[in-house]
Amino acid sequence: ADNVCAEILKHHGECIAVQANVSDPAAVKMPFAQSISHFGSIDLLINNAGILLFKEITNIQDDEFDRIIDINFKSVFYALREASTKISDNGRVVTISSTVTRMMLPKYGAYAATKAAVEQLTRTFAREMGTRGITANIVSPGPVDTELFRVGKTIQDIERMSAMAALGRLGKVDDIAQVVLFLVSDEARWINGQNIAINGGII
């Protein structure tokens, strides 16, 4: 977060970094309060916190399941609930999901379930907030070359998943960021409640 802030400040923008436990409903209030205190208002929310649990269902322990539910699912609920009263009219919300919700990939069961859940939360939020001009959309990346993606995977796993895309490569962070940037712009004002796949052609 500090590196991102430094980059923003270098380009003459404004930035603050706030650390909070997104699985704690009380803690989720803090970034909203500090953002309003510093900037005066909140215009957009990106739900991007998440962890990966890469295990077959039979091997998932109760504490592991609880943790991924807390971080991937409950955090989005808490953030949307807080945003419902804090985000400005005509604001923008983007939730990061995953292409795996549309597939049957081994070892992705718990992760895919949390992402499917936040997709529905976001669609419902879009409906509930629409009269205020607030849009809420979902982006569903395919395999993107990040530290999170590589958790628990062998070289063979990574090569196999790279080959799934018609473009024949892993995604890059910027491939996703550019679509998110569009969705929070004025040009996307008539896009609402949608799920946009960004996966290089995984069908």
Go through each PLM region and give its residues:
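Alpha-helical segment proximal to the catalytic Tyr-Lys
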Residues: 85-86, 127-131, 189
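Substrate-binding pocket helix/loop in short-chain dehydrogenase/reductase
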Residues: 56-57, 61-69, 158-161
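Active-site loop-to-helix junction immediately N-terminal to the catalytic Tyr of the SDR YXXXK motif
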Residues: 60, 104-112, 124
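The beta1-alpha1 cofactor-binding region of Rossmann-like NAD(H)/NADP(H)-dependent oxidoreductases
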Residues: 19-31, 62, 175
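Active-site helix of classical SDR
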Residues: 80, 114, 122
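C-terminal helical subdomain
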Residues: 138, 160-191, 198-200
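Residue(s) in the substrate-gating loop at a strand-loop-helix junction
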Residues: 98
